[in-house]
Curated annotation (Swiss-Prot):
It is a multi-pass membrane protein. This is Cytochrome b. Binds 2 heme b groups non-covalently. It comes from Hypsugo savii (Savi's pipistrelle). PROSITE patterns: CYTB_CTER, CYTB_NTER. Heme 1 (or BL or b562) is low-potential and absorbs at about 562 nm, and heme 2 (or BH or b566) is high-potential and absorbs at about 566 nm. The lineage of its organism: Eukaryota, Metazoa, Chordata, Craniata, Vertebrata. The gene is MT-CYB. Its main location: mitochondrion.
Length: 367
């Protein structure tokens, strides 16, 4: 009799994806982030589900419901801060995962890569809408500023913004729909992740050398399950340190003030993981130009496979490309720093130069 693991129609799929999956024998810890992202997603859906049970999506009570959750609900503060800092861990893993793909040429699996870019957009949209829900000052003004950018679209812009707002300003209707979408999107993301994995398992994993490893494969379990568990423990250690010792380190203190449409905070800025894109947006003095640059800064990932001209897939044996890659990383860190600074003399020009360099490296210098 065959093992049920290999004969049962449903368990067979799980077996071929996570247990008997042939994997290259030489993939490094940079390949752990896919599984960590899956764990982050599961964690976010779980904590989010329990948070949604206590949350009210109404402008009058949203802020108080979050406050009530932290004070009155059993371990509500753990749920809330796990969810908020879990989003930060999600983006850390996401950016490292993308960086790994860029460094080792994993983008040559075009379907997997494009699916990943769609996933990135979906996760960013979800995170943005989630940030609006506590209805603090930054939530309200962040939503106002970012949704207002759509008004830069010629001809339909103004109507589009009012359509998204459900009125003439960010108000009750906006909050309600953002909550609905924030609840729905993670499940759509889960489905897209399945497609992402489906495309990946068509080709098999890439490896650090960038050469085919078909002649040297090992089963995923136990080798990589153990390796992933180590990564999981390390991630949970960092997350729990954040949640239990300094849960507000990555947040904005302005968000502890209830939203007030009559009072603008001195510095409106998004969460840290959007600062690089925000800096690119601000570095262009024209509204439409800024919005285009913002969208292109992420959409540019789509064209990377077509810019690949090297005979080697991975950067492992290309020192010059490595220098450029780390220059790109440094540039993104600079942009992240600039995004959090006020719009004043030295920061404006640094942001503009960093934005130009970002696009230059990817389009002109890299290939």
């Amino acid at each position: 009799m065959t093992n049920i693991r290999k004969s049962h129609p449903l368990i067979k799929i799980i077996n071929n994806s996570f247990i008997d999956l042939p994997a290259p024998s030489n993939i490094s810890s940079w390949w752990n982030f896919g599984s960590l992202l899956g764990i982050c997603l599961a964690l976010q859906i779980l904590t989010g589900l329990f948070l949604a049970m206590h949350y009210t999506s109404d402008t009058a009570t949203a802020f108080n419901s979050v406050s009530h959750m932290c004070r009155e609900v059993n371990y509500g503060w753990v749920l809330r801060y796990m969810h908020a800092n879990g989003a930060s861990m999600f983006f850390i893993c996401l950016y490292l995962h993308i960086g790994r793909g860029l460094y080792y040429g994993s983008y040559m699996f075009k379907e997997t890569w494009n699916m990943g870019v769609i996933l990135l957009f979906a996760v960013m949209a979800t995170a943005f809408m989630g940030y609006v829900l506590p209805w603090g000052q930054m939530s309200f003004w962040g939503a106002t500023v970012i949704t207002n950018l759509l008004s830069a679209i010629p001809y339909i812009g103004a109507n589009l913004v009012e359509w998204i707002w459900g009125g003439f300003s960010v108000d009750k209707a906006t909050l309600t729909r953002f909550f609905a979408f924030h609840f729905l999107l993670p499940f759509i993301i889960s489905a897209l992740v399945m497609v992402h994995l489906l495309f990946l398992h068509e080709t098999g994993s890439n490896n650090p050398t960038g050469i085919p490893s078909n002649m040297d494969m090992i089963p995923f379990h136990p080798y990589y399950t153990i390796k992933d568990i180590l990564g999981f423990f390390m991630m949970m250690l960092i997350l729990l340190c954040l949640v239990l010792f300094s849960p507000d380190m990555l947040g904005d203190p302005d968000n502890y003030m209830p939203a007030n449409p009559l009072n603008t905070p001195p510095h409106i800025k998004p969460e840290w993981y959007f600062l690089f894109a925000y800096a690119i947006l601000r570095s262009i003095p024209n509204k439409l130009g800024g919005v285009l640059a913002l969208v292109l800064s992420i959409l540019i990932l789509i064209i990377i496979p077509f810019l690949h001209t090297s005979k080697q897939r991975s950067m492992t044996f290309r020192p010059f490309s490595q220098c450029l890659f780390w220059l790109l990383v440094a540039d993104l860190l600079t942009l992240t720093w600039i995004g959090g600074q006020p719009v004043e003399h030295p920061y404006i020009i640094i942001g503009q130069l960093a934005s130009i360099l970002y696009f230059m490296i990817i389009i002109v210098i890299m290939p």
